[in-house]
């Protein structure tokens, strides 16, 4: 029966080949082949895109991920904290709910060691250790500071008690017995405090006021010659100028013409150097500056009067007639007690072309030769000018012109008289 059915099936198939249904199947198979061809092209295109994406991913893994490792570390740290919190909640809920462990954590730790939990734990421990050390160091510093304040306060208190005892104790005679004073009959504590206050005022006056009432000795008596006028000179920036260089260090430069100035002024003036510098600085300089002894007296800082932060030269203690005293200085604050006795000279800064001392010689010579009774009148006139020496030069120039003009007029008046005499005598 099967053999009889096979030819029948074949015959049916052969019959179907000649029918329109066969053509339909053929068209369907062709369309399916075309669709497969398009799908194969699309698959190749997707394969190429996937290959390029793999290359980009490999490049990103080699370059961008190491730079982004700290950010990934922070994300992992947050996720780990969240996981631990979730685990605690799950433990509270039930023992069967076990938290899931991220399977990629060991892989990330191998790829990026800096993001591993072990490194995070070590860094946290080091940070805590540093904070603890800093806190301990701050505590030690604060203890040292408190100890320093305590020592300083104790020293100040001890110094205060010592000052009260030392400056407040009464004076004693050669036998060691206390000398009675105005505080003897007062309570003991009050005695010491008031004596200390009196001592403070004494040292304050010693600093502010001159060391002695008469700065200069009395004028010389005959047969010795006492110059009529007294010339008071500032040393710094009038006679010498301090100069400092790397090669020589500090040294004092002589003003141009200072030797001639001292020699000429010593003929008519009693020369006194009065400066606010210390004696240990002044005396060696004047010894080298004036080997001939033209400078008769030297007054230093202890002879000044300290007023409003300035060392002022108080001429009242000079023991000389102020009508005959001329002070040459560039600092107005140093002579503000007696401005009418001051002749302001420009401050010398060490330049070699300076010639003001030569003009000053001429000015002083005129005063001495004219026997001016009160030099303050002349000095008061020149005090109104910013540069008295320049004004003196201008006055001398005008005086010379006036003298020449007077001489010319005198000569012009004399010539007609000679002509008239010769006309009368000679008949011409």
Swiss-Prot record:
GO molecular function annotations of the record: cysteine-type endopeptidase activator activity; protein serine/threonine phosphatase activity; protein tyrosine phosphatase activity
GO biological process: mitochondrial membrane organization; mitochondrion organization; protein dephosphorylation; protein import into mitochondrial matrix; protein localization to endoplasmic reticulum; protein localization to Golgi apparatus
Biased composition, class Basic and acidic residues, residue ranges: 124-138
InterPro entries cross-referenced by the UniProt entry: FCP1_dom, HAD-like_sf, HAD_sf, TIM50
Keywords: Membrane, Mitochondrion, Mitochondrion inner membrane, Protein transport, Transit peptide, Translocation, Transmembrane, Transmembrane helix, Transport
Chain ranges of the FCP1 homology domain: 224-367
Protein transport keyword on record: yes
One family name in Pfam for this protein: NIF
Keyword Membrane part of the UniProt annotation: yes
Region feature Disordered, mapped onto this chain: 112-138
Transmembrane segments: 59-79
Topology term for the membrane: Single-pass membrane protein
GO cellular component annotations of the record: endoplasmic reticulum; Golgi apparatus; mitochondrial inner membrane; mitochondrion; TIM23 mitochondrial import inner membrane translocase complex
PROSITE patterns: FCP1
Mitochondrial intermembrane side: 80-428
Chief place where the protein resides: mitochondrion
Protein location: Mitochondrion inner membrane
Alphabetized SUPFAM superfamilies for the sequence: HAD-like (SSF56784)
CDD domains per the UniProt record, alphabetical: HAD_FCP1-like
Function as written in the Swiss-Prot or TrEMBL entry: Essential component of the TIM23 complex, a complex that mediates the translocation of transit peptide-containing proteins across the mitochondrial inner membrane.
Self-association state and partner proteins as the record states: Component of the TIM23 complex at least composed of Tim23, Tim17 (Tim17a1, Tim17a2 or Tim17b1) and a Tim50.
Family to which the UniProt record says this protein belongs: Belongs to the TIM50 family.
Protein name per Swiss-Prot or TrEMBL: Mitochondrial import inner membrane translocase subunit TIM50-C
Gene designation per UniProt: ttm50
């Amino acid at each position: 029966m099967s053999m009889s059915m096979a030819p029948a099936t074949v015959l049916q198939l052969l019959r179907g080949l000649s029918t329109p249904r066969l053509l339909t199947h053929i068209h369907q198979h062709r369309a399916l082949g075309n669709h497969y061809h398009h799908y194969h092209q699309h698959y190749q295109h997707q394969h190429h895109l996937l290959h390029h994406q793999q290359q980009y991913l490999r490049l990103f893994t080699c370059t961008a991920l190491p730079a982004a490792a700290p950010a990934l570390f922070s994300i992992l740290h947050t996720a780990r904290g969240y996981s631990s919190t979730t685990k605690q909640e799950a433990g509270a809920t039930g023992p069967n709910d076990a938290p899931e462990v991220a399977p990629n954590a060991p892989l990330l730790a191998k790829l990026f060691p800096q993001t591993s939990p072990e490194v995070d734990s070590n860094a946290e421990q080091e940070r805590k250790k540093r904070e603890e050390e800093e806190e301990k160091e701050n505590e030690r510093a604060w203890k040292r500071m408190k100890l320093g304040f305590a020592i300083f306060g104790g020293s100040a208190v001890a110094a205060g008690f010592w000052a009260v005892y030392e400056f407040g104790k009464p004076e004693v005679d050669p036998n060691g017995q206390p000398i009675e004073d105005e505080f003897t009959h007062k309570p003991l504590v009050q005695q010491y405090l008031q004596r200390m206050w009196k001592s403070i005022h004494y040292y304050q006056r010693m600093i502010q006021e001159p060391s002695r009432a008469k700065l200069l000795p009395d004028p010389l008596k005959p047969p010795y010659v006492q110059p009529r006028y007294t010339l008071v000179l500032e040393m710094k920036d009038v006679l010498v100028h301090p100069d400092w260089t790397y090669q020589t260090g500090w040294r004092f430069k002589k003003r141009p013409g200072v030797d001639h100035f001292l020699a000429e002024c010593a003929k008519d003036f009693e020369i006194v150097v009065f400066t606010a510098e210390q004696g240990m600085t002044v005396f060696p300089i004047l010894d080298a500056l004036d080997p001939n002894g033209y400078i008769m007296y030297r007054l230093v800082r202890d002879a000044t009067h300290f007023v409003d932060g300035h060392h002022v030269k108080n001429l009242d203690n000079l023991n000389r007639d102020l009508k005959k005293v001329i002070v040459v200085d560039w600092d107005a604050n140093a002579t503000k007690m007696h401005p009418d006795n001051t002749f302001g000279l420009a401050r010398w800064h060490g330049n070699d072309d300076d010639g003001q001392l030569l003009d000053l010689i001429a000015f002083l010579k005129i005063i001495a030769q004219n026997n001016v009774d009160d030099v303050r009148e002349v000095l008061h006139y020149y005090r109104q000018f910013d540069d008295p020496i320049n004004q003196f030069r201008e006055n001398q120039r005008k005086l010379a012109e006036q003298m020449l003009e007077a001489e010319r007029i005198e000569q012009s008046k004399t010539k007609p008289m000679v002509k008239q005499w010769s006309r009368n005598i000679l008949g011409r």
